[in-house]
């Protein structure tokens, strides 16, 4: 079968990725020497994995068999995919749920015929995961995201924004547990090189987490102007989401301005429930940051009326508001399957607020100091459990714990 030089280079790089992933699982048969034994020389394998070309396609065929993959290129399918990808990105840009769903189904109907072939197997997986993300709100595992990162540089440009969206869907949730890893991974996917405007939301998030507020403000203005000019009200709501977060840090007077913008937008236009839920959640966060806990609790609750997403994180924030208002802790129940998708630190925080009322204060203190403290790096989470600990030591008189808590936090955040 004839395969273009460009695709051969990509296939070779994929072979390198797959071999390294297998070798990382301590499978000795995937070392350079063992892997190519009887097929080609070590130098030839190194050349192939770096994107160089072999003189014989048979080498690729035999190497791919080790991963149960076939060798080939189908230009007719590629051309059809490029057309459908354009439609998919347009649907994502306006968050047209039904068109996203229908387009991915069409794409995978094409790909299912060739999903046993190298490159197409990756596309089939990417599209399947994209479907799960947009249609079923899937949370991805670290292993899945790491694989997407491993193949990112080797994918054709037209598919990179799809990968960026998948990778960012995980990073926006997991950043609180490892900010350094978040920054490294965000820099890896080069959001500034994205071809589609909606991917810039990842850049807004990056500016927020790295506290580059001036850059974030400039990008916000640019995106608000663009989406107003294109009458894309769903994405305009997304811009407002980030505006609430930004201005809660730098200029709280602007928050009320954006609340009025949201009210006007949601009154005039029919918008997806998930987007209204997100905007209410971020209004709640802006009030939370200003210690206006009653308003925050109101909007967190309103958010869940429209869409029950990210229940674990939302539950922690709701519990904090209830705690500070002197209310009984009453947070959303999370199914086990969904719960297991979250990082350990977030699960431990949620479990804390699920402790029975009868659990003694000294047991709660120990839980915070032993189980939670090693994972606390995010300012919001630190503040939540610093407050909780201060309440507990009033009962136990163990004020030394507050000093130890502050000392350990400084170690984590210095």
List the predicted regions and their residue ranges:
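Short alpha-helical DNA-recognition segment
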Residues: 23-47
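Extended amphipathic alpha-helical coiled-coil/heptad-repeat regions
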Residues: 125-411
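A short, Lys/Arg-rich alpha-helix, primarily the initiator
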Residues: 1-26
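TPR-adjacent "capping" and linker segments in tetratricopeptide-repeat scaffold/adaptor proteins
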Residues: 2-6, 71-83, 376
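Helix-turn-helix/homeodomain-like alpha-helical modules used for DNA recognition
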Residues: 81-135
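DNA major-groove recognition helix of helix-turn-helix
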Residues: 19, 48-49, 59, 67
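Alpha-helical residues within helix-turn-helix
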Residues: 17, 31-34, 58, 62
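DNA major-groove recognition helix of helix-turn-helix/homeodomain DNA-binding modules
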Residues: 56-74
């Amino acid at each position: 079968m004839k395969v273009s030089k460009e695709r051969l280079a990509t296939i070779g790089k994929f072979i390198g990725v797959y071999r390294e992933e297998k070798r990382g699982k301590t499978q000795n048969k995937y070392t350079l020497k063992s892997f190519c034994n009887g097929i080609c020389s070590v130098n030839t394998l190194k050349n192939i994995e770096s994107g160089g070309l072999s003189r014989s396609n048979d080498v690729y065929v035999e190497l791919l068999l080790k991963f149960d993959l076939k060798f080939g290129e189908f230009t007719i399918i590629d051309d059809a995919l490029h057309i459908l990808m354009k439609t998919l990105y347009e649907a994502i840009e306006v968050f047209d749920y039904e068109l996203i769903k229908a387009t991915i189904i069409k794409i995978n109907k094409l790909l299912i015929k060739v999903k046993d072939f190298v490159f197409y197997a990756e596309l089939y997986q990417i599209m399947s995961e994209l479907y799960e993300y947009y249609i079923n709100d899937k949370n991805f595992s670290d292993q899945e995201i790491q694989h997407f990162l491993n193949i990112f540089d080797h994918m054709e440009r037209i598919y990179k924004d799809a990968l960026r969206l998948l990778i960012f869907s995980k990073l926006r949730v997991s950043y609180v547990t490892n900010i350094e890893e978040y920054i490294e991974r965000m820099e890896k996917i080069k959001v500034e090189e994205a071809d589609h405007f909606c991917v810039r939301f990842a850049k807004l998030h990056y500016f927020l987490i790295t506290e580059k507020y001036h850059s974030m403000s400039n990008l916000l203005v640019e995106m608000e102007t663009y989406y107003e000019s294109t009458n894309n009200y769903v994405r305009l709501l997304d811009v407002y989401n980030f505006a609430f977060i930004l201005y809660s840090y730098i200029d709280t007077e602007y928050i009320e301005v954006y609340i009025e913008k949201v009210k006007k937008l949601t009154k005039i236009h029919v918008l997806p429930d998930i987007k209204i839920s997100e905007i209410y959640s971020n209004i709640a966060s802006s009030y939370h940051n200003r210690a206006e806990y009653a308003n925050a609790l109101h909007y967190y609750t309103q958010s869940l009326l429209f869409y029950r997403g990210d229940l674990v994180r939302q539950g922690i924030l709701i519990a904090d508001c209830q705690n500070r208002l002197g209310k009984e802790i009453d947070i959303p129940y999370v199914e086990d399957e969904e719960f297991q998708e979250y990082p350990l630190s977030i699960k431990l925080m949620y479990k804390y607020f699920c402790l029975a009322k009868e659990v003694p204060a000294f047991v709660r203190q120990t839980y915070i100091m032993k189980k939670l403290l090693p994972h606390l790096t995010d300012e919001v989470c630190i503040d939540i459990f610093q407050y909780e600990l201060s309440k507990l030591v009033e009962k136990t008189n163990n004020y030394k714990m507050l000093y130890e808590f502050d000392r350990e936090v400084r170690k984590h955040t210095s």
